């Protein structure tokens, strides 16, 4: 074995880091840390007493609590929706499984802020749904703004992160373990809890992490739903020259993000891989086969039908206006160009980091 491949191992993984990927990963890490270092440097300039005063203000504490509640509730809702949907579309004889597999993944193509605009237009004050119910004497609908509405919107457009990762894990899982559990007279719920959940837990944790980070970083949806979270308040403070408050809130946001990453790693634990024959026998839903379609259709319909219907109504209204709607091709070109460039950079930057983390043991790859 030559010198380049003669490496130590740690629990089956090599421990001697290759020079090229290490330099690339270090460069990526440095680029990511530059904004954080600027925040820390600027935060030190605020002064200890001023920082304590700003961070302990009731409004600052309210923003922290609002953000924590939004992330916790939305992530929990995404798991509660995504995992059952994945199980139904992979492991059961749900009718039209292929159709529902696509339908419940489609909310990813709708930006959450577009969904927020659509829901406010439909269910907000004097919205389309309220006008529809006005002849029946309904003068006001429950308030859609605030925490509840924001959780609803973000859940509808981020649960696919959990669904897709859980579905991939369920499809690759060795179901002979489930068959073995059933032969030991475990019922379906106990089999799911003791066999299925431990195997899909890393995938579910990864999907929940994506949902949580999306919620934490989202600016458009909380702004439309009039709910003060880190991103919205930081933007307002920077715009009004409240740089000290914005910097301290940004540092809080970074700290919360690090905590979420740590928590995900603890929940995920060590990833499990199974080998052997795979049984593709589906779970028979029996008399619940067709009723099980109702919650699946409700989730997909709420996330897709409402925004599409509102957008079509706007399009129809614009066709009769004096200045009909025209397609802004320059905006579309800019969006596609920026998205493609960002995706390419993300892939190039992510490969060395992912390679080192997955291939080599030790703490340093984990730091990258």
Protein language model regions, located:
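Membrane-topology segments of multi-pass transport proteins
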Residues: 1-20, 24, 48-53, 135-136, ...
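C-terminal transmembrane helix and the adjacent membrane-cytosol boundary/short C-terminal tail
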Residues: 2, 10, 38, 94, ...
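Peri-membrane helix termini and adjoining interfacial loops of integral membrane proteins
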Residues: 2, 40-52, 124-136, 225-231, ...
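Membrane-water interface segments at the C-terminal ends of transmembrane alpha-helices
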Residues: 14-46, 58-170, 199-219, 245-262, ...
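A short amphipathic helical element positioned immediately N-terminal to and/or at the very start
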Residues: 48-56, 320-323
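Hydrophobic positions on the alpha-helical face of helix-turn-helix-like DNA-binding modules
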Residues: 180-181, 191, 195, 234
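Glycine/proline-centered hinge or cleavage motifs at structural transition points of membrane proteins
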Residues: 184-185, 198
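Glycine-rich helix-loop "coupling/hinge" segments at transmembrane-helix boundaries
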Residues: 216-243
